[in-house]
Amino acid sequence: MNEELNSWDKFCNYLWFDKKLNIWLDISKIIFTNDDIVTLEEKFTDVLSSIKELENGAISNIDENRQVGHYWLRNPSISPSSNIGEEISADINEISEFGKQILNGNIKNKNNQKYTDVLWIGIGGSGLGPLLITESLQKCSKGLNFSYIDNVDPFLISEKLEELAEKLSTTLFVVVSKSGGTPEPRIAMEIIKSHCENNSLEWNSNAIAITMKDSKLFNKAISENWLKIFNLQDWVGGRTSITSSVGLLPLALINENIFEFIRGASLMDEATRTSDFKNNPAALLSSAWYLTGDGVGKRDMVVLPYRDRLQVFSKYLQQLVMESLGKKFNRNGEVVNQGISVFGNKGSTDQHAYVQQLRDGIDNFFCIFIELLDSPSTNIFDGKENPKEYLSGFLQGTRSALSSENRQSITITLEKLNCFSLGALIALFERSVSFYAELVNINAYDQPGVEAGKKAAANIIDYQQKVSNLLEKGGEYSINEITSLIDNSVSEPIFFILREMCFGNEDYLVKGDWSNPNSLVIQKRNS
């Protein structure tokens, strides 16, 4: 056992607590020396300076030539212009008032019925952020019921429509797309809209857009007279959009306090602006990531919240951390292949699953435990074994069992889970991601890999159309013949397209064996 991981002095020396936030951060079970901290401390003057430039409105997403302003959303006074600050404040108040009007029934559907449900259509941060909000904070029988379409899986879409069948007339359809051109929400929106129209159900008067002004979605919502349009600023990225209208509207519609959510995030932002290293939680957390991974992401991040309501948090962090830090090049154009892989579920469930490997298997990770001190106000546990005490015991036991094998971990403790503390927790990780990116000299706010994937997908969709058009002309074609007519470099994608299009589909006659692609000959019937 590494005695350093169980040093009481180290624990006391590096434990961070803020009495305004009632959050603790313990990095003592990360292996490092005081000299390591001194070395990093010297770098943090430049880190804080870079973050300050970002907050002042510097162009931080170079690829898209835009500012990065999600920190302004929770403190409009620091935005680079009074116009931006006033717009943010107006948006927040508009969302709050709209939520009240929906919940108290002042805004109803065309049949004068109160709305009961929300079908949220968004992908990436536009889906994960709202899902985290509702899963973490929605209380029984409060606000509207939420369902999500965050993919173009045909089964998902059909199942959601089936689940909401009797309630579609009282369902708000919220479509989130900053540009309005993202294929997944657009396709899902068109399917849902068509379903409503084909079944004599309202779409336009039940539909809400969250998008940029003058985007394709904005113009569509205007022309079709949708119920509402909420602003999504150009300088807000998807993975950091949770304190924008993307996260605030769900809060308002589940009858939670959006101002407390913003206040928690704002106070955490403020706590991370101090130049006092040991009193800066984002400096401590990002340094722990840096030290345990040798500054090159050698270890995966395993997120273990010991509360079911935070189960989605690990998925949320997957996008926030991996999309921000997974970069091939640093700012000097050098190949660095940076990144931290993130996975997790919840405790104590994971103690009966992969924690076995964490303790006894390959040592390629660090854990982030998240614990809460509160418990529900109820008498159902009186005279019974207290589940809260057991849950705490399981967390401490797992933490101890890991450290006994020199496995590293971080522990974050919240007094309770509410709008305020969730806002603060999210802000802590957002700031830590920014700090880490500065430490390793990468841009946290571009996503060239995502854009490359989108372009490749667009190419495949183009090939799908070309294959379909070719088969419509009639005649038999082998894969080699099809590729020679379309693009000789894409034989494998053509095989995948044909399998998706033709396997089990009686509209096509297929000769040959699917296990031998070169033997396949395909013809469209009746063509």
Swiss-Prot record:
What the entry lists under CDD domains is as follows: SIS_PGI_1, SIS_PGI_2
Q: Where in the cell is it found?
A: Cytoplasm
Q: What residues make up the catalytic site?
A: E323 (proton donor), H352, K454
Q: What is its EC number?
A: 5.3.1.9
Q: What is its main location?
A: cytoplasm
| Catalytic activity, reaction form | alpha-D-glucose 6-phosphate = beta-D-fructose 6-phosphate
- Look up keyword Methyltransferase and say if it applies: no
Q: State the superkingdom.
A: Bacteria
Query: Which pathway does UniProt place it in?
Result: Carbohydrate biosynthesis; gluconeogenesis; Carbohydrate degradation; glycolysis; D-glyceraldehyde 3-phosphate and glycerone phosphate from D-glucose: step 2/4
Alphabetical UniProt keywords: Cytoplasm, Gluconeogenesis, Glycolysis, Isomerase
Q: What class of enzyme is it?
A: isomerase
Q: Which GO terms describe its molecular function?
A: carbohydrate derivative binding; glucose-6-phosphate isomerase activity; monosaccharide binding
Q: Name one GO biological process term.
A: glucose 6-phosphate metabolic process
CC terms in the record's Gene Ontology section: cytosol
| UniProt record similarity statement | Belongs to the GPI family.
Cross-referenced HAMAP family: G6P_isomerase
- UniProt function note: Catalyzes the reversible isomerization of glucose-6-phosphate to fructose-6-phosphate.
Q: What is this protein called?
A: Glucose-6-phosphate isomerase
Gene responsible for this protein: pgi
